[in-house]
C-alpha cells in the first residue's frame, strides 16, 4: 500500500467522535495522466468538526510550495481531498459550491472524498465536475 493511500485510510471517520480531515493533493501531471505522490494533512488552523472540514492552515500551501521547489517544478498542486462520515460518500451541496468557487484552474483538478468503506473520486474542469467512479465498459 502506498504511503498516500495509507494516510487516506488513517483519516477515515470510523468512530462517532471522528472529525472530518482534509488537505491538498500533490503530484505530477504527465500529459493526460496524473500521478499522486503526496498530500497535505490536517493541522493547526484547520477547522474540523464531524461534518465539516475547512482548510485554513498555512501548512497546506507551504507543503505545496516546498515540494514544487524541491522537484524543480515537477510536483504541483493537483486538487483537494477530505473525509465524510459515510460508508459510500457523495459530494454535498457545500462541497460542490466550494469547489466551483475555490478551485479556479485551467488544468483539471482532482477531487477526493474518503469514506469509511469506499471513496468518491472526481475531476473538476472549468465549471464541470464529474465523478470518475463509474465503471468503464471494456467490451
Predicted ranges, named:
Residues 1-77, 86-139:
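Conserved beta-strand-loop surface patch within small alpha/beta domains used
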Residues 83:
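Conserved residues at the C-terminal ends of beta-strands
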Amino acid at each position: 500500500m502506498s504511503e498516500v493511500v495509507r494516510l487516506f485510510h488513517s483519516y477515515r471517520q470510523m468512530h462517532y467522535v471522528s472529525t472530518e480531515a482534509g488537505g491538498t493533493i500533490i503530484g505530477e501531471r504527465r500529459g493526460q495522466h496524473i500521478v499522486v505522490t503526496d498530500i497535505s494533512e490536517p493541522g493547526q488552523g484547520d477547522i474540523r468538526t464531524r461534518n465539516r472540514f475547512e482548510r485554513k492552515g498555512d501548512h497546506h500551501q507551504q507543503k505545496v510550495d516546498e515540494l514544487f521547489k524541491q522537484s524543480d517544478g515537477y510536483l504541483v498542486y493537483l486538487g483537494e481531498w477530505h473525509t465524510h462520515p459515510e460508508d459510500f460518500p457523495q459530494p454535498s451541496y457545500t462541497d460542490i459550491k466550494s469547489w466551483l468557487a475555490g478551485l479556479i484552474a485551467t488544468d483539471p483538478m482532482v477531487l477526493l472524498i474518503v469514506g469509511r468503506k469506499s471513496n468518491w473520486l472526481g475531476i473538476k474542469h472549468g465549471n464541470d465536475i464529474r465523478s470518475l467512479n463509474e465503471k468503464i465498459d471494456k467490451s
